[in-house]
Each structure stands twice: as structure tokens, then as C-alpha cells.
């Protein structure tokens, strides 16, 4: 496909749905919150482990995430998707959210995995915003990185210019889709952030 919009939109509607089995786990974080993890494990208890990072407002139900998890498990990998805060099935406890430059939760989680599975290779793959987070983490860790391998998929390296693009022409389709998802996500977070951001649900949903 040579058209970037067709390449982006078609898989959303025509890619086969992957019904991947998984188990959810809540991992408590040092600041008193939690990270929700979706585990998909093979029968081999010593299988190499791959961490999957979703994109902006994605989650375990994102088609690209499930597709990657199914493909990796088929190859014998243990797979775990790390939800960014407030992208999970339950609302996080703290007002803190996530962004493309925040690597703290990823670093904490990978260190946790390294302690839990000291002899198993650990890899990571990040999509879109998750790719931004992963790339920044790799740059921060450099030669001390505990990962054996990593892949960054479709990450908007220049976020400023990418933001400008989605404000124009067909890009507005993506802007509306992402903004609607972000507003719904923030709406369920209102009780936690009302002191920091005094906004009503009605005001929030009118943001465009």
C-alpha cells in the first residue's frame, strides 16, 4: 500500500480479529499506584519474555497489540502487555497519567521482570507512543539496558510536526478519534484530578 491513510485505516477494519487469551495482574508501583499487566504465557516456563507497549489510549483490546501478542506466543515467547496509567480496565488511584517522555513505569517494570526472571531473555516492542517511550528508555539506559532486544514500530519521533499534520486535511480524522478517546479516558478519571483540574464532565466533553 502506497497511501499512508489506507495503510493506517484498513487494518483497523479488515485485519482478522485475534482472540488471544490472557490473564490480568495489578503490579503496585513505588508511588502507591499500580500498573495493569496482561499476560499471555506458553507452556514452557523458561520461554523468553517480550513486553508489548501500546499506543496513545490503546490497551489489550487494540488490534495491533493482540496481533503481536498472538504472533509472539505462536513463536514460543511469553508475552506481557503493560498498560499505561488509566488505559487499563480499572481507573488508577493517583492523578498521574502518562506521556511519551515518561519512562519511569517502564523502567520499574523491566527491573521487576529482571529480578523475577533473572535467567530469561527479555525483549520489548513498542507501538506509536509506546514506541516513543521505549526508544527514550533505550537511550537513557544505553549499555546498562537489561533488554536483550527491542523494536520500535511507527513511533512519531517528532511529536510537534506530527501534531501539526493531524490538524490538517484527512489528519483531522485521527485527531478526532484520539481526542474522543482521551476525553472518555479523562472523564472516568475526574474524581482523582478534580483538585488539580477543576473541570466538569460537560466542559470536558466540549473540548475540541
Where are the regions a protein language model picked out?
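N-terminal cap/lid segment of alpha/beta-hydrolase-fold proteins
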Residues: 3-44
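Catalytic nucleophile-loop/oxyanion-hole region of alpha/beta-hydrolase
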Residues: 71, 85-123
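Alpha/beta-hydrolase-fold enzymes
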Residues: 115-208
Amino acid at each position: 500500500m502506497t497511501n499512508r491513510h489506507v495503510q493506517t485505516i484498513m487494518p483497523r477494519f479488515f485485519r482478522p480479529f485475534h482472540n488471544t487469551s490472557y490473564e490480568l495482574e495489578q503490579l503496585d508501583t513505588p508511588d502507591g499506584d499500580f500498573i495493569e499487566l496482561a499476560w499471555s504465557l506458553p507452556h514452557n516456563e523458561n520461554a523468553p519474555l517480550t513486553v508489548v507497549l501500546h499506543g496513545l489510549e490503546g490497551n489489550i483490546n487494540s488490534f495491533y497489540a493482540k496481533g503481536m501478542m498472538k504472533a509472539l506466543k505462536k513463536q514460543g515467547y511469553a508475552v506481557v502487555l503493560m498498560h499505561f496509567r488509566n488505559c487499563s480496565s480499572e481507573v488508577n488511584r493517583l492523578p498521574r497519567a502518562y506521556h511519551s517522555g515518561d519512562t519511569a513505569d517502564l523502567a520499574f517494570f523491566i527491573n521487576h521482570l529482571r529480578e523475577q526472571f533473572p535467567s530469561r531473555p527479555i525483549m520489548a516492542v513498542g507501538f506509536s507512543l509506546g514506541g516513543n517511550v521505549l526508544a527514550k528508555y533505550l537511550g537513557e539506559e544505553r549499555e546498562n539496558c537489561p533488554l536483550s532486544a527491542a523494536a520500535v514500530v511507527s513511533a512519531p519521533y517528532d511529536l510537534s510536526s506530527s501534531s501539526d499534520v493531524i490538524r490538517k486535511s484527512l489528519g483531522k480524522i485521527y485527531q478526532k478519534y484520539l481526542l474522543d478517546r482521551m476525553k472518555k479516558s479523562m472523564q472516568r478519571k475526574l474524581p482523582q484530578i478534580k483538585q488539580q483540574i477543576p473541570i466538569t464532565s460537560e466542559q470536558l466533553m466540549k473540548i475540541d
